[in-house]
Amino acid sequence: MQEVRILLLALSLLMTTTSSVHAKESETTNETSPSKASAKQAKSAHAPHASSQDGAAIYARYCALCHGDDRQGYAADDAPSLRSPQLIGSAPGSYLWTAISYGRPNTPMAAFQDTLGGPLSHDAQHALMDWLIKESGVKRTPVKDEPVVGDATLGTKVYEQHCAECHGAEGEGGTGTALAHPVFLATASDAFIRHTIANGRDGTPMTAFAERLSEPEINNVVAFLRSRATGWKESTPTLAPPPDPANAVLNPSAAPAKLDEREGRFVSAKSVAAAMERGERMVLLDARPMSDWQRSHLPGALPMPFYDGVKELVPHLPNDGTPIIAYCACPHAASGHVVDALIKEGFTSARILDEGVLIWAGLGYPIALGADPSLNQ
């Protein structure tokens, strides 16, 4: 597990462009102005918008796979609970909005805003947020944005003792949130972070520390986390059109890829990379939201978001033993969903990339970056 965390941290550092924004500026970044999508982008770069009328249906289609049918969290890859009263009750609206819109780049949490290639329109995001707030049953009283004064050096020691086990030695995340992530630090105010440390989140592994740590100790942890900020700004990138599914098969005239399998369901990154190097025949499907494909993907991979269903792609896929390899960042939830759907359609050669795309990239295997450099900030 430690090796995996190191690889994820290395990938995050590699693909996150350091902004000129000073960490101090991040302290006051507590409101985000939602932007509306370009109709041209929405039509050409991803699937049609979700309906804005039914937040429950939006959640079930796009969120439940990882966050759980009842918002309980931890259904896949430690995705957090979305029904915690402390989260819904205290988080600024801009924090919730940005988390849905921009996700957490280089983690399993993708961007869902349509201007980034995601499936949700401006109105659909509002419907989802309104539904999450309503279902929580709590009265929202977002904490006031008051800067916290603390000692980052002293906070380092407190963090190492009480936080690193879940959140990672460098804040890269683990079973807990990636607290050093640029988007998190740019959108979570000092007061919100302090409130979360003190009060915890019911129904999650995040316990309250108000009775275990003094107020200065909590403030010092906040100062330590704030010192990790590198700056982040929202942007609206240029999106590339998805590739033609008629070209789904890579190296169509070559022999089928020879892959190392596990349990008849998973194939190793090492064997897939070797087959790519040998120029063998295969199909690669990116099961993440289109926004992640726009950011980076395995060379030649087709976007096949887990929430879209496989029916439209089926006519373009070979059913002659050619390996069809789906991947995601979870590393198995979204890709497994797609593979299960393909197997039901009779594609028995469908497999899951065992390590997922983040570990794939961390191991130095080929990655195609998106057309717009701002996507890699």
Q: Which role fits each region the language model picked out?
A:
Residues 259-333:
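Positively charged, proline/Ser/Thr-rich regional signature most characteristic
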Residues 226-284, 292, 373-377:
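Flexible, polar/low-complexity N-terminal or interdomain linker segments that lie immediately upstream
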Residues 1-8:
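Bacterial N-terminal signal peptides that target proteins for export
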Residues 24-58, 134-158, 260-263:
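Electrostatic cytochrome c docking/interface patches
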Residues 49-51, 56-81, 102-111, 135-140, ...:
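Periplasmic/extracellular electron-transfer cofactor-ligation site
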Residues 24-25, 76-77, 81-132, 174, ...:
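Extracytoplasmic electron-transfer domains, predominantly the class I c-type cytochrome c fold
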Residues 8-17:
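Bacterial N-terminal signal peptides
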Residues 314-360:
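Catalytic cysteine-centered active loop of the rhodanese-like fold, especially the PTP/DSP P-loop
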